[in-house]
Amino acid sequence: MIEWKRVTRQEPCPVCKKPDWCGVSADGAWCVCMRAESGHASKNGGWLHRLKDAPPPPKFRPPPTRRRNLLASLASYHAALRLRWDWIWLDGLALSLGVDMDALERLQPAYDPANKAFAFPMRDGGGAVTGIRLRDCGGHKWAVRGGGDGLFYDPAMAAAGELAVCEGPTDTAAALTLGLHAAGRPSCSSGVDALRALVRRLGCRKVTVIADHDGAKRRPDGSAWFPGVQGARSLASVLGRMTRIVVPPEKDLRAWLIEGATRQDYEALAASATWRLG
């Protein structure tokens, strides 16, 4: 499996030269550029580019037991944080986010005193913890080192004929506040494999992808693209279910909820979207 790292200002995308959205393989052999097209579309959005003069992929792979032990440690770490969790923290966080307290609790958040941030577990399609997303009071987001991507959802959810897919834990809490069966991806281009597994396990027949209302980004040729919608389309194309894409009138679902959106408002907007297979 190829290991990817995000581009930065110090190490921008080698294709479009931008400091965000794109990724480069750890061995320097490949680049997924979200702006410059190639003949190979990436399943998570963007296009795959083979970099010139790149070194061959390494043959060595770490022992698989190491990964399993690490995930077990993350699950134990989250469980230990949950033992200290108190309804006062929950009430304050729910109030600051503008979501329902019970809906937020279904995601099993915790407070991490070492990082001075709230901790949201990321799970695979079977419910096991695969990583921990951190969010401080200023809204800054990062993850506990050593974990991987996963989904934000209620581990008690056993079945759902229709699933709403959001971006991030707070939008997922907003969807749960509206009374939806929901799961959140870490970003608009990740969590695909876990979501496929979750959809199969829950018996989902339909999936509504709720895309962030992002501003337009520019490709090198000057054409515009919208990360949230592009990521939603890429996801819809690989789920193998009836899907539709909904874009809230505010920057994301939680912002729309804060502005007073109701379940009826959501259903009216969703009804205007077209169901498609793939």
Place the predicted regions along the sequence by residue.
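Acidic beta-strand-to-loop metal/phosphate-binding motif
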Residues: 165, 205-226, 246
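Short phosphate-binding/catalytic loops that engage adenosine nucleotides
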Residues: 180, 240, 244
